[in-house]
Amino acid sequence: MAECLHIVGAGMAGSEAAWQAAEMGVPVVLHEMRPKVGTFAHRTGQFAEMVCSNSFRSDDDERNAVGLLHWEMRAARGLIMEMAAAHRLPAGGALAVDRDPFAESVTARLRAHPLISVVEEEVAELPSSGNWIVATGPLTSSALAESLRALTGAEALAFFDAIAPIVYAETIDMEVAWRQSRYDKGETEDERTAYINCPMNREQYEAFIDALLAAEKTEFHEGETAGYFDGCLPIEVMAERGRETLRHGPMKPVGLTNSHRPAEKAYAVVQLRRDNKLGTLYNIVGFQTKMKYGAQTAVFKMIPGLENASFARLGGIHRNTFLNSPTLLDDRMRLKLRPNIRFAGQVTGVEGYVESAAMGLLAGRMAAAEILGRDLPPPPPETAMGALVTHITGGAEAKSFQPMNVNFGLFPPIDARGGRRGRKDRYKAYTDRAKAAFTEWLGA
């Protein structure tokens, strides 16, 4: 039998890495500290628990980089994408999932695999021998982070990440709010009505911004300094950047028509997305926050339609850690100072559930191939996975390295016409090229 692969962390990346390696015939020991050791953000001991939102973002694999990443992971028979499909919720053109059954099914599949053993323990030190993948995510334990600092001599970088609140659907006033996906996107009626929309006129919007700016915020610990990831900014931080920022961000009113008052154009719109299959819970889209709990309920109840809302969960903020991967990792995602250890997921400086799982998929395949005596190069940079791994292992500037979502700016340029129509053609050219390159890489 092949040597064993140890994986630390059973989040998106660790779960996918374990599945890929085991499917290649390599025995896996999956180390997960939860539920024995908890974190600020996690509620359960389930694997692949979704703590920020329940969305894998756009599922458009022809003109969207994250949708292309979905396609590549499906082509590679990824467990995360398979389970996401099994627990998919209507969300217009996005891929949203029922988060608890999703995590339960990922956990069950991994625990049932004959080549995967699960050990519920905290790994506090970087091991000096054996084959390891560290996929501890943004909430890496302080002991392991300290071990990493001691080995590399480098400070782990950090940024703050916020979580959006969840509302009980039955407490939303549907005489004010209405159901509609932006631009009526979706092939079914469920998809076209996947979001609940709460309209604001100008006076309501201005009062909301005033309250948001004045609300009491969570204070950070003394000496704790870090930036925010731009893709997950707290709404009050966005409001501080300008009073109109939210109107052009998560509260933009475009592509929506109030079914109660079709002739009336909203000045701003707050959207809520279904958070579970039953449709009993909705999260407020883009409303991650660091306001204190009392302030949250007061401010969010100013939203028309949410005056009597009850919250299943309020928002919160936590500190994320990630490596300066361009300095520390090679192109096989191995730690240069200790090549028996690979890193995967958000700890490497990718941002997002899908990106994390994709890096887990690659790390799992690369580690398994190495154990089996083969060398597996990363996918070409023309692919979504290849573009991401190239970025984190050397494509990014080490001095200014920050967490990154997948986007077409990471891909080698392609010649195409300019303008709006040209941009759509260019994105399609990116995805066509990527699919061909990824298919060839998979078959090699």
Swiss-Prot record:
Keywords, sorted A to Z: Cytoplasm, FAD, Flavoprotein, Methyltransferase, NAD, NADP, Transferase, tRNA processing
Enzyme's top EC category: transferase
Protein's UniProt keywords contain Cytoplasm: yes
Protein origin, superkingdom: Bacteria
Binding residues annotated for FAD, in chain numbering: 9-14
Essential cofactor(s): FAD
Cellular compartments per GO CC: cytosol
Location of the protein in the cell: Cytoplasm
GO molecular function, one term: tRNA (uracil(54)-C5)-methyltransferase activity, 5,10-methylenetetrahydrofolate-dependent
Main localization category: cytoplasm
One GO term of the biological process aspect: tRNA methylation
InterPro entries for this protein: FAD/NAD-bd_sf, MnmG-rel, MnmG-rel_CS, MnmG_N, TrmFO
Keyword tRNA processing listed: yes
Documented EC number(s): 2.1.1.74
Catalytic activity: uridine(54) in tRNA + (6R)-5,10-methylene-5,6,7,8-tetrahydrofolate + NADH + H(+) = 5-methyluridine(54) in tRNA + (6S)-5,6,7,8-tetrahydrofolate + NAD(+); uridine(54) in tRNA + (6R)-5,10-methylene-5,6,7,8-tetrahydrofolate + NADPH + H(+) = 5-methyluridine(54) in tRNA + (6S)-5,6,7,8-tetrahydrofolate + NADP(+)
UniProt xrefs under HAMAP family: TrmFO
Family as reported in the entry's similarity comment: Belongs to the MnmG family. TrmFO subfamily.
Function as written in the Swiss-Prot or TrEMBL entry: Catalyzes the folate-dependent formation of 5-methyl-uridine at position 54 (M-5-U54) in all tRNAs.
Protein name: Methylenetetrahydrofolate--tRNA-(uracil-5-)-methyltransferase TrmFO
Native species: Cereibacter sphaeroides (strain ATCC 17029 / ATH 2.4.9)
Lineage of the species this protein comes from: Bacteria, Pseudomonadati, Pseudomonadota, Alphaproteobacteria, Rhodobacterales
